């Protein structure tokens, strides 16, 4: 480990951080200056080829010292200016990716058609109508009838439950002849009831859709007789054609680098074990704008390639211009390298996929030439907080029913969730590029939730979108706590509301119009439920505080009495609970039938279900208020900030819980007092809502605790098969994550500017390779001068990123820091090394060719 109490001369200190033989270190130590040192490292002529920048000239030599395997893998290249670079990505072979402008206004579209300026969608593929399309249309028609029938009966019952039944006796002409106050008193109860009835019908129809989806999923999984199952079209052992090349792409942005590259390594090794590695390439597509994380990604890429011998198969690209977020990241990949591949598998930063699953997806694509997207059903795993474990259990137990049910109703016109799916590259390039939504405001601009839109465009072009719901080997992780989940929901809510602008776009398949609608209802149902509860409370207030109007028309002989039918209310309440909770019971019954050992046994899985149901009841009102806020914020253009502090073990601090849930607690308390004052008996009906709101702070904090999650696992509660018998890929991910965190790189930009090896790596991976021009030299000089003046603590992020992307500027900064012995840079770097218990001992030992050469932060 470094000892800052024994200062060294800068030249000797520099050489101590290069893995050299003692004789070579002594020879280089005779250099009179750093310029001479870099010239000796680079060899004769190299400095002149690098344009007179000695530190830039020695980049290759320094990299060879730290990572001699780069030479064996032929990873070095020289650009047009004679500067060394690493072949971190394949040669670019550009493909046109042209998004079609959206025409969301049907009036404008009609006018353009009348004036002969219509721009129709691109023509569909000339494919015969398959049998599954007719079957799917019939099934969805039946689903619609079931939902409407069920909703009609429930709404009829609800109408009979409401107390005011005399709306038909209200005479509009009579209302115009009386005072406004009398009119309000007479009509207000019926207006409120009408609002309650309308909201109830919408919400019940939404619940009904989920019920029938789960019910048919239960039938599919119980019988196993799904003749349209996409995974049944391949035996799973067919040879993959040599030209069926597949790119596995992982878009990332400011992610947890140790976890991301651990999961990717597990996936790469699993793929290699199948023997099909030659047909797959891996791409890490970074949109990271944090310089420290960007340097950590570069080092992690090198270590990953070294450990897996993946040079030339695992590629890395960081965008300097972050356009259109994730969809733009994918577009950029398709534009540069999409023409080299027949298929593309998209993974999230937390995704892990087995090699068998990846190979199976390619075989399914080969066996189904009409398929454009095949989506797997990722299994959630890998988290330890109590909240995450409950969510993992819920998605693992209940999720298969809903996924199989979606497949039953949608068949080849299904969902795409944006990750853990395979895509046919050419139609994706031709039809799925996303133009920004026209106009101004919060619902214009770059599309946020791209996945549903891409699936709709793929289907509009005539290609199928399938869910391989029974395909194993696809995994993901869930947010560790409620607040992190809500932060994700904030983005999804806005994105789904934006997508609804595409509901009437020409050529969209009716199923995908329905998908846009269900995406909106996933979040719009929250304010609808909230307003339903508010109107119910308002009706209670009207009933208690206003004198009933018994005679609603002149010369009426008999009064209209408010009515109350508790037996109907109980029946309707029971029916609603059945629709909500029967799918969960059916899921557990399916596990009973097929074997509950992986879930902890029959008793444990049943107890886990009951506990999860209890927590879901507690959390539903909390989510309702947050989602209501998100919807209102999106419509009103409000900015909702979520600047969560760094947490230990992903736990929610009490201070943050109070800040996020404090208003909900006060609302629950005020609501309780109001209803208790109006009619205490009504609290029995409202207690699950207001009680959950008042308990939101402790529930949010306690459920985020890792200790409680681990204790539940020890008791076999919320156990999932991936924990009982952990797949090889998940075991490897955990192991590699632990290893990566052990030597995780900190202060990445500082070390890229100062450390001899990391500076060489960053320079070789820099992508801003400009020709020589006076204007460029002026900008470089300004950036370097700013870095020297401000120091590592005060330098802004934009300048750091610009320096990191420019190998010339970064090498000059590196040289100037050492030549001038800049204490603000060198002192900060030495302190960071001293504070790192896993930093390498200096002087670094020589790396023998063929050994696993390591960068400094990776040694222990």
UniProtKB/Swiss-Prot annotation:
<keyword id="KW-0472">Membrane</keyword>
<dbReference type="InterPro" id="IPR029044">
    <property type="entry name" value="Nucleotide-diphossugar_trans"/>
</dbReference>
<feature type="transmembrane region" description="Helical">
    <location>
        <begin position="141"/>
        <end position="161"/>
    </location>
</feature>
<keyword id="KW-0997">Cell inner membrane</keyword>
<comment type="function">
    <text>Involved in the biosynthesis of osmoregulated periplasmic glucans (OPGs).</text>
</comment>
<dbReference type="GO" id="GO:0005886">
    <property type="term" value="C:plasma membrane"/>
</dbReference>
<feature type="transmembrane region" description="Helical">
    <location>
        <begin position="682"/>
        <end position="702"/>
    </location>
</feature>
<keyword id="KW-0328">Glycosyltransferase</keyword>
<keyword id="KW-0808">Transferase</keyword>
<dbReference type="GO" id="GO:0016758">
    <property type="term" value="F:hexosyltransferase activity"/>
</dbReference>
<comment type="similarity">
    <text>Belongs to the glycosyltransferase 2 family. OpgH subfamily.</text>
</comment>
<keyword id="KW-1003">Cell membrane</keyword>
<protein>
    <recommendedName>
        <fullName>Glucans biosynthesis glucosyltransferase H</fullName>
        <ecNumber>2.4.1.-</ecNumber>
    </recommendedName>
</protein>
<dbReference type="InterPro" id="IPR023725">
    <property type="entry name" value="Glucans_biosynth_gluTrFase_H"/>
</dbReference>
<feature type="transmembrane region" description="Helical">
    <location>
        <begin position="187"/>
        <end position="207"/>
    </location>
</feature>
<feature type="transmembrane region" description="Helical">
    <location>
        <begin position="515"/>
        <end position="535"/>
    </location>
</feature>
<feature type="transmembrane region" description="Helical">
    <location>
        <begin position="599"/>
        <end position="619"/>
    </location>
</feature>
<keyword id="KW-0812">Transmembrane</keyword>
<keyword id="KW-1133">Transmembrane helix</keyword>
<dbReference type="GO" id="GO:0009250">
    <property type="term" value="P:glucan biosynthetic process"/>
</dbReference>
<dbReference type="InterPro" id="IPR050321">
    <property type="entry name" value="Glycosyltr_2/OpgH_subfam"/>
</dbReference>
<dbReference type="Pfam" id="PF00535">
    <property type="entry name" value="Glycos_transf_2"/>
</dbReference>
<dbReference type="InterPro" id="IPR001173">
    <property type="entry name" value="Glyco_trans_2-like"/>
</dbReference>
<comment type="pathway">
    <text>Glycan metabolism; osmoregulated periplasmic glucan (OPG) biosynthesis.</text>
</comment>
<feature type="transmembrane region" description="Helical">
    <location>
        <begin position="572"/>
        <end position="592"/>
    </location>
</feature>
């Amino acid at each position: 480990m470094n000892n800052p109490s024994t200062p060294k001369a800068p030249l000797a200190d520099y050489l101590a951080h290069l893995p050299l033989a003692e004789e070579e270190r002594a020879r280089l130590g005779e250099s009179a200056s750093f310029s001479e040192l870099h010239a000796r490292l680079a060899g004769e002529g190299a400095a002149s080829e690098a344009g007179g920048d000695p530190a830039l000239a020695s980049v290759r030599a320094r990299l060879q010292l730290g990572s001699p395997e780069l030479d064996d893998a032929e990873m070095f290249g020289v650009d047009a200016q004679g500067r060394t670079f690493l072949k971190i990505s394949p040669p670019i072979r550009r493909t046109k990716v042209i998004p079609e402008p959206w025409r969301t206004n049907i009036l404008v579209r009609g006018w353009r058609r009348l004036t002969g300026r219509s721009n129709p969608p691109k023509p569909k593929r000339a494919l015969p109508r398959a049998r599954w399309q007719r079957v799917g249309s019939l099934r969805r028609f039946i689903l619609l009838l079931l939902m409407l029938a069920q909703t009609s009966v429930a709404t009829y019952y609800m109408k009979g439950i409401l107390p005011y039944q005399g709306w038909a006796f209200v005479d509009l002409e009579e209302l115009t002849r009386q005072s406004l106050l009398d009119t309000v008193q007479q009509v207000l109860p019926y207006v409120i009831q009408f609002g309650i009835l309308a909201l109830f019908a919408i919400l019940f129809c939404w619940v009904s859709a989920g019920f029938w989806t789960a019910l048919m999923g239960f039938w599919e999984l119980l019988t196993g007789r799904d003749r349209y199952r996409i995974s049944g079209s391949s035996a799973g052992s067919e040879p993959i054609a040599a030209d069926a090349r597949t790119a596995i792409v992982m878009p990332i942005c400011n992610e947890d680098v140790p976890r991301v590259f651990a999961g990717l390594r597990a996936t790469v090794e699993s793929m290699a074990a199948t023997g099909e590695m030659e047909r797959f390439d891996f791409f890490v597509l970074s949109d990271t704008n944090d310089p420290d994380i960007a340097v950590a990604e570069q080092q992690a890429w090198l270590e990953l390639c070294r450990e897996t011998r993946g040079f030339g198969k695992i590629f890395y690209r960081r965008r300097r211009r972050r356009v259109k977020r994730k969809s733009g990241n994918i577009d950029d990949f398709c534009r540069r390298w999409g023409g080299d591949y027949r298929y593309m598998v998209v993974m999230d930063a937390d995704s892990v996929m087995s090699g068998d699953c990846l190979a199976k997806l390619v075989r399914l694509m080969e066996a189904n030439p009409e398929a454009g997207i095949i989506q797997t059903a990722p299994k959630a795993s890998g988290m330890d907080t109590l909240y995450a474990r409950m969510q993992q259990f819920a998605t693992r137990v209940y999720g298969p029913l809903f996924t199989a049910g979606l497949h039953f109703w949608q068949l080849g016109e299904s969902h795409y969730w944006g990750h853990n799916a395979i895509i046919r590259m050419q139609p994706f390039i031709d039809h799925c590029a996303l133009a920004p939504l026209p106009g101004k405001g919060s619902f214009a601009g770059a599309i946020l939730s791209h996945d549903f839109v891409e699936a709709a465009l793929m289907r509009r072009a005539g290609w199928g979108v399938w869910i391989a719901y029974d395909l194993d080997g696809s995994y993901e992780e869930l947010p560790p706590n409620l607040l992190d989940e809500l932060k994700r929901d904030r983005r999804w809510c806005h994105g789904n509301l934006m997508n609804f602008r595409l509901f009437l776009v020409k050529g969209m398949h009716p199923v995908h119009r329905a998908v846009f609608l269900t995406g909106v209802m996933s979040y719009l149902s929250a304010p609808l439920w909230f307003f339903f509860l508010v109107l119910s409370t308002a009706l209670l207030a009207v009933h208690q505080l206003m004198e009933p109007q018994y005679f609603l028309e002149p010369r009426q002989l008999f009064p209209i009495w408010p009515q109350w039918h508790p037996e109907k209310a109980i029946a309707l309440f029971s029916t609603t609970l059945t629709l909500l909770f029967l799918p969960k019971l059916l899921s557990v019954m399916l596990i009973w039938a097929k074997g509950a050992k992986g879930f902890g046994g029959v008793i444990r899985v049943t107890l886990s279900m009951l506990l999860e149901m209890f927590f879901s009841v507690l959390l539903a009102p909390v989510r309702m208020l947050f989602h209501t806020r998100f919807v209102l914020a999106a419509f009103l253009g409000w900015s909702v900030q979520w600047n969560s502090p760094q947490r230990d073990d992903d736990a929610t601090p009490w201070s943050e819980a109070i800040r996020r849930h404090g208003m909900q607690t006060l609302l629950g308390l005020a609501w309780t007092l109001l209803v208790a004052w109006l009619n205490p008996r009504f609290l029995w009906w409202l207690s699950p809502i207001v009680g959950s709101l008042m308990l939101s702070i402790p529930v949010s904090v306690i459920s985020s605790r890792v200790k409680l999650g681990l204790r539940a696992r020890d008791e076999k509660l919320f156990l999932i098969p991936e924990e009982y018998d952990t797949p090889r890929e998940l075991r490897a991910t955990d192991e590699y994550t632990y290893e990566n965190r052990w030597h995780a790189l900190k202060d990445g930009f500082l070390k890229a500017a100062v450390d001899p090896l990391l500076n060489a790596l960053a320079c070789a991976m820099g992508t801003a390779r400009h020709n020589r021009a006076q204007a460029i030299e002026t900008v470089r000089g300004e950036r370097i001068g700013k870095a020297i003046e401000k120091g590592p603590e005060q330098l802004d992020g934009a300048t750091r990123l610009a320096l990191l992307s420019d190998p010339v500027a970064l090498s000059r900064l590196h040289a100037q820091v050492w030549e001038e012995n800049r204490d603000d840079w060198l002192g900060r770097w030495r302190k960071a090394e001293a504070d790192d218990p896993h930093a390498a001992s200096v002087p670094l030992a020589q790396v023998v060719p063929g050994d696993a050469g390591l960068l400094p932060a990776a040694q222990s």
